[in-house]
């Protein structure tokens, strides 16, 4: 989809400048002060970007979360010695990486080569990162070994370079899924999973192939997400148009898989006039998390500032001049987090607890306070 990729590049740049891709108040209230704050985010250093509060809404309670009636002032229990030794910080930032076409030889600015994908995933594996799905991230229930770091791998537009099955029923060589599985084989402990956000052209497959392919992905631990039928800019569409784009795609996914999706990624990162149009339509779709096309890691799902309706992502790219990738794309952010490990999400190894340094106690979302542990 060359034209879409060209448009995507332009829209993402505009989003950075205008602050459209950065999180803000849910459901309105965008006064001039807020707009100025978001517009300035593009010129901040990574540290400044993290420090700037965006007024997000709390994360939703997931399975095992604290009761809403739990006291917000109750003392937080001490962390396990092993968690403290691992320097766990489960209020740290989480990279949610955004990929588009995967090709042997990139053609457009958003493309990544199979080698670039392999090298980046290998870097993640060697750096102690462990992939989780977008749904697991949003729900705040995932398992990462103590001392490790979660990362969410997302692939937009369901292009042929993402996935396909050969005659033997195995992932086709040089596709994203094949590369992910190769890196997992070479790096024990690196979980082979990712989230694929689908448009109508399902990896270049017909409906029979798509049904088999989507079944294979789900059976092997990959997540399927909604990305609309035709990848339009939802910001300029009517309620009817927004619901048709999302609902028709959801109908097709449900027909092919027998299941509904949990998460949604905005095409171009563009939010419609009323966010509720995209979030839910009774009897048709209802998402638990919505992903943007932003330029910084996400806040932890346990942080009181986490907004599940506007989750930041980072474009996969090296430190190139285009779109200020020297500072805001994946290589730059991974370098930054390596140099500032205290700002990165580091797991305590126990999915039933949320461990962090005592100095960060005021940041824990109230619904997770009963699971909190400090040191």
PLM segments and residue spans:
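Short, well-structured secondary-structure segments
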Residues: 95-98, 130-134, 152-153, 176-207, ...
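Juxtamembrane extracytosolic/periplasmic "stalk" immediately C-terminal to the first targeting helix
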Residues: 31-41
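Histidine- and/or cysteine-centered catalytic micro-motif in compact active-site loops
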Residues: 199, 229-230, 269, 295
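C-terminal active-site subregion of NodB/CE4 polysaccharide deacetylases
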Residues: 1-26, 40-44, 48-51, 55-58, ...
């Amino acid at each position: 989809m060359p034209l879409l990729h060209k448009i995507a590049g332009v829209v993402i740049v505009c989003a950075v400048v205008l602050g459209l891709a950065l999180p803000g108040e849910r459901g309105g209230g965008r006064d001039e002060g807020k707009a100025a704050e978001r517009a300035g985010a593009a010129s901040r250093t990574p540290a400044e970007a993290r420090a700037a509060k965006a007024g997000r809404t709390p994360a939703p309670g997931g399975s095992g979360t604290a009761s809403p009636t739990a006291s917000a002032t109750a003392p937080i229990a001490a962390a396990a010695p092993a968690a403290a030794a691992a320097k766990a910080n489960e209020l740290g930032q989480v990279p949610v990486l955004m990929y588009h076409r995967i090709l042997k030889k990139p053609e457009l600015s958003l493309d990544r080569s199979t080698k670039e994908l392999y090298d980046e995933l290998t870097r993640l594996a060697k750096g102690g990162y462990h992939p989780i799905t977008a749904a697991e991230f949003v729900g705040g229930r995932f398992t990462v070994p103590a001392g490790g770091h979660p990362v969410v791998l997302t692939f937009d537009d369901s292009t042929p370079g993402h996935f396909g099955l050969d005659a033997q029923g195995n992932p086709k060589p040089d596709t994203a899924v094949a590369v992910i599985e190769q890196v997992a084989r070479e790096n024990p402990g690196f979980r082979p999973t990712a989230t694929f956000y689908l448009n109508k052209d399902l990896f270049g497959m017909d409906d029979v192939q798509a049904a088999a392919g989507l079944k294979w992905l789900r059976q092997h631990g990959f997540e399927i997400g909604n990305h609309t039928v035709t990848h339009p800019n939802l910001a300029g569409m009517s309620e009817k148009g927004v619901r048709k784009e999302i609902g028709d795609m959801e109908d097709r996914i449900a027909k092919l898989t027998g299941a509904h999706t949990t998460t949604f990624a905005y095409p171009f990162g563009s939010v419609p006039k009323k966010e509720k149009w995209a979030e839910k339509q009774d009897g048709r779709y209802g998402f638990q998390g919505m992903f943007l096309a932003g330029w910084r890691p996400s806040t932890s799902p346990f942080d009181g500032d986490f907004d599940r309706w506007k989750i930041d992502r980072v474009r996969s790219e090296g430190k190139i001049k285009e779109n200020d990738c020297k500072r805001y794309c994946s290589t730059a952010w991974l370098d930054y987090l390596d140099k500032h490990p205290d700002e990165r999400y580091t797991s305590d190894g126990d999915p039933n607890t949320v461990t962090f340094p005592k100095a960060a106690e005021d940041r824990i979302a109230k619904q997770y306070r009963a699971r909190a542990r400090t040191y």
